[in-house]
Amino acid sequence: GFFAGQIDISGTKYNLVVADKSVGEAVKKWGPQADTTGFTSIIDGPTNSAGISALGSNYEAARFCEDLNTGGFTDWYLPALNELTTIYYYLKPGTTANNTGTGSTANAVSPQPISTNFTSGDPAQTTATSFQTGASSQEFVLPPANYWTSTEFSADRARIRDFNTGDLGAQLKTTVTNYARAVRRVLA
């Protein structure tokens, strides 16, 4: 896996690690549309993901991440909203301007240690060249597309983050497919 940023959760700092793309990324549905799971945390991906996965194989995105065994690790999970936002902040693949919502709008979600809303140029394209759109090898790049989070929004929708403009959304769990990228936490 690869370092993908650091997040502070209740005073404890964690390094986020994204799984290798070849084994740790897939296009999946989130889960059954009319089923409210109750997993709505924006910071606790491990609890969200494990709980969702335990509900059965219909919860494709979380189950894919939870079932991953790579690099000698089995503690992979589908990230919560703030974890995925941190990954976008540090590994944004392209140069497209960000959505610049403010206040309580979509891009006001500011995971720690990030403490400001997005601007059109911040976050900028990652300096990790292997993760940039247009890299000679696309082996590590997070495509500029929508990624599921483990954060449920409603009975029929779950949160997504667009890795092109940073937009935050909520899409239908069972009729829409998006990317799922497995991550893990390591104490910083």
Task: Describe each region flagged by the PLM.
Residues A62-D75, L81-N164:
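An exposed tryptophan-centered "aromatic clamp" motif
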Residues G1-F73, Y90-P93, N164-A188:
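Short, compositionally biased
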